[in-house]
A protein has these predicted regions:
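Conserved MFS/SLC helix-loop-helix module at the cytosolic interface between two early adjacent transmembrane helices
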Residues: 50-86
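C-terminal transmembrane helical hairpin of 12-TM major facilitator-type secondary transporters
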Residues: 264-313
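Cytoplasmic helix-loop-helix junction between adjacent transmembrane helices
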Residues: 94-136
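Extracytoplasmic gate region of multi-pass secondary transporters
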Residues: 19-20, 198-251
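A late C-terminal transmembrane helix in Major Facilitator Superfamily
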Residues: 316-355, 362
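Paired small-residue
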Residues: 78, 89-98, 290-299
Length: 389
């Protein structure tokens, strides 16, 4: 069950990498400028950045299973329809439908995972959510790689059609799996609309600040490797993919900590505080290739630790029945907001003050997030020295 729900996350995150890989072909075929295609790429985060918390409440009212089915169906329809886009209107329209599908999956699947794993104890639940936290780097890399490969054989329209067919197949598997809906009692429904604990707000805001510099740095890494290191665009893209996927190794480390019942307060602080310091070794004038790439990989590995522990904290900060959906929606909204704003803000820093200015911004964002993360990790219900229950 957890694996099937994780595959839904991979499918959703693959849409993040799909359009990036197909952007040059789409721009050439439809006669669009690359900035216009770049806007289409970013549209998938708009829904999460503006409606994440609201979507969490709607998912609670509609039912998690129904929300997940609808999300995967939107991804399938958008993939098949987008393959027939004839201009900017069609491209944007199908991408917005894709954003709806993406949002439906990310607000429902992790909550279903948490509900399913809860029966096996808090430690297993934390490990399951740690697995879920890898869906973005893994799905993004998979989407970019698969789309590029299929486009080489069948063109960008063929690649998008194939992606839509995969989504249809996954929807069919979901339908036959008969997922439990985990319907809540009326009391739990009322509690879902109650105020979230301050520690949950701290976790969500800290996660947003983390995404601000983490995604911003990853987005600018190819440009730095081309302009300052002298790599080709293809090599820069490949090393950026390696850096992104290294977050999965960080998630494995987080899983090891959870499995051994370690307190996560200091791992949370270290994995949030060290990456912006490493960024000063990456975002500099004419860095050595092996130094910049090595530090970027380490930076994203540590980021994977923080992201995984943040998801593992969710069920302990949203301990009231019914609040898990809303808490997950809030975390998704803050993370999407940071992902949406981080690249343009850090690019503006580079333009105004050079690469070091972007590293300074990353440090400021991290300093703002540290006390928030400390409060969340120190909450009395969230010392993840988990027992065997």
């Amino acid at each position: 069950m957890v694996v099937l729900l994780y595959l839904c996350g991979l499918l959703a995150a693959a849409q993040l990498g799909k359009l990036s890989a197909l952007a040059p072909l789409i721009a050439s075929s439809l006669g669009l400028s690359l900035p216009v295609v770049a806007i289409a790429i970013s549209l998938i985060e708009v829904g999460g950045a503006t409606l994440g918390a609201v979507a969490g409440l709607l998912a609670h009212k509609l039912g998690l299973r129904r929300t997940l089915y609808g999300g995967v169906a939107c991804l399938a329809l958008a993939g098949l329809g987008g393959a027939w886009a004839q201009g900017v209107t069609g491209l944007f329209g199908w991408r917005l439908l894709e954003a709806v599908g993406y949002l439906g999956v990310i607000v429902s699947a992790p909550v279903l995972i948490a509900h399913h794993a809860e029966a096996f104890g808090a430690r297993v639940q934390g490990l399951a959510l740690t697995l879920w936290s890898t869906f973005v780097p893994a799905g993004l890399a998979l989407g970019a790689w698969a789309s590029a490969g299929m486009a080489a054989a069948w063109g960008w329209r063929g690649a998008m059609t194939a992606g839509g067919i995969v989504a249809v197949a996954l929807w069919g598997v979901l339908w036959r799996a008969h997922l439990p809906d985990h319907a809540e009692a009326p009391t739990a429904t009322r509690r879902a609309t109650a105020k979230l604990a301050p520690a949950m707000w701290c976790l969500a805001l800290g996660f947003g600040a983390f995404a601000l510099f983490e995604i911003g740095a990853l987005a600018l890494l190819p440009t730095l490797l081309v302009r300052e290191v002298g790599l080709s665009a293809q090599a820069a893209g490949q090393w950026t993919a390696v850096a992104s996927v290294s977050g999965i190794a960080g998630s494995a480390l987080a899983a090891w900590l959870l499995r051994h019942g370690a307190s996560v307060r200091w791992p949370v602080m270290a994995s949030l505080g060290l990456p912006p310091l490493l960024l000063f070794g990456v975002f500099t004038t004419a860095p050595q290739a092996h130094v910049a790439i090595g530090l970027a990989v380490l930076l994203n590995m540590l980021g994977g630790v923080f992201a995984s522990l943040a998801f593992a904290l969710l069920p302990r900060l949203a301990s009231e029945p019914g609040q898990m959906v809303r808490a997950n929606g809030m975390l998704a909204q803050c993370g999407a907001s940071g992902s949406l704003l981080g690249p343009p803000i850090m690019a503006a820093c580079v333009q105004a003050g050079g690469w070091t200015a972007a590293a300074v911004f990353g440090l400021i964002a991290s300093l703002a997030a540290l006390p928030l993360a400390w409060h969340a990790a120190s909450h009395r219900a969230n010392r993840l020295a988990l027992d065997a229950s």
